[in-house]
UniProtKB/Swiss-Prot annotation:
May be involved in several stages of intracellular trafficking. This is Sorting nexin-32. It comes from Homo sapiens. Belongs to the sorting nexin family. SUPFAM superfamilies: PX domain.
Length: 403
């Protein structure tokens, strides 16, 4: 397996198909990417007329860890607590494809040279598809930030886009990964405590509906993603199964007498063409359906995180009200309690205002994306079904027409 791969503008799939309606004053894209063993280097190109930047067009080279650093910087910034932070791109993972190629290279005496070449071609195509999707997901993350009227003004985002040197960001060690896992557990427990034992009542029907909807939506999206992956893998397995069938028929075509030779060769060609068609079906389903579901599973989690932050702010506001009542009853430290209550109130109202707009934008974005991807997938599957029918019909006609 080659440890070096490169993709340019023409080679990127629109695997998430996120609808980005930002203005043209800040345009970001990944113009090139190179894979070197376990690292992928992305060339991030920026075009902007914003006064903050010294130039109107520039590019930098970034690695995955720097994308994660940027995402974490947004999540940890209190100013963005009322916003849906775009989900971080997944870590590049080519290990499975490399292991398959390594096993194939170790050799199997039962595999013919023709079968080996076809299987190697399939695995290399799979590796390239994963690489292109990795690039596309990193690009979508940056474009979501660039299109957002608030997130695009972040200082760290400017540094990420413009600073020409390495950002000296390292990957998280095991202790930090464990810490993040424990924080998620604490957050889940805190949310359950707020909504359950404390008996906190939601004061806005809009957010109560959104919370109920997102809990169900996230579960359904996750289940649909698992099912879509199973269907896609079934198509891939079918395409792989056609390889030995085609090879066996081709071998028979070279051994039999003239009367059967033509039939075997035509059948071998049939299964080879069906193999390529099934491969395209699997690729389209992976790109248009599985990847979209996987992306919105992460995006819906980001929306759930936003609702948790607002719920936490509401709980803090309620606790501040109780503390103020106690202070007034005791007639002690009333002014600090009033000041704290006002701050909690302002934070809760600020988060509520921005969260409502963010959730409405999330709805329109996902509806547009689902409509676009599902229509395109249906059109592609109709095209492939017609092509498959035509191949079978032409093969039958050719076989019947033989002397």
């Amino acid at each position: 397996m080659e440890t070096y791969a490169e993709v340019g503008k023409e080679g990127k799939p629109s695997c998430a198909s996120v609808d980005l309606q930002g203005d043209s004053s800040l345009q970001v894209e990944i113009s090139d990417a190179v894979s070197e063993r376990d690292k992928v280097k992305f060339t991030v190109q920026t075009k902007s007329c914003l006064p903050h930047f010294a130039q109107t067009e520039f590019s930098v080279v970034r690695q995955h860890e720097e994308f994660i650093w940027l995402h974490d910087a947004y999540v940890e910034n209190e100013e963005y607590a009322g916003l849906i932070i775009p989900p971080a791109p997944p870590r590049p993972d080519f290990e499975a494809s490399r292991e398959k190629l390594q096993k194939l290279g170790e050799g199997d005496s039962s595999v013919t040279r023709e079968e080996f070449a076809k299987m190697k071609q399939e695995l290399e195509a799979e590796y390239l598809a994963i690489f292109k999707k990795t690039v596309a997901m990193h690009e979508v993350f940056l474009q979501r930030l660039a299109a957002h009227p608030t997130l695009r003004r972040d200082h760290n985002f400017f540094v990420f886009l413009e600073y020409g040197q390495d950002l000296s960001v390292r990957g998280k060690n095991r202790k930090e990964l464990l810490g993040g896992f424990l924080r998620n557990i604490v957050k889940s427990a805190d949310e359950a405590l707020i909504t359950g034992m404390s008996g906190l009542k939601e004061v806005d029907d809009f957010f109560e509906h959104e919370r109920t909807f997102l809990l169900e939506y996230h579960t359904r999206i996750r289940d649909a993603c698992l099912r879509a992956d199973r269907v896609m893998r079934a198509h891939k397995c079918l395409a792989d199964d056609y390889i030995p069938i085609s090879a066996a028929l081709s071998s028979l075509g070279t051994q039999e007498v003239n009367q059967l030779r033509t039939s075997f060769l035509k059948l071998a060609e049939l299964f080879e063409r069906l193999r390529k068609l099934e491969g395209r079906v699997a690729s389209d389903e992976d790109l248009k359906l599985s990847d979209m579901l996987r992306y919105y599973m992460r995006d819906s989690q980001a929306a759930k995180d936003l609702l948790y932050r607002r719920l936490r702010a509401l709980a803090d506001y309620e606790n501040a009200n109780k503390a103020l009542d106690k202070a007034r009853t005791r007639n002690r430290e009333v002014r600090p309690a009033e000041s704290h209550q006002q701050l909690c109130c302002q934070r809760f109202e600020r988060l509520s205002d921005s969260a409502k707009q963010e959730l409405m934008d999330f709805k329109s974005r996902r509806v547009s994306s689902f409509r676009k991807n599902l229509i395109e997938l249906a059109e592609l599957e109709l095209k492939h079904a017609k092509a498959s029918t035509l191949i079978l019909r032409n093969t039958l006609v050719a076989l019947k027409g033989e002397p």
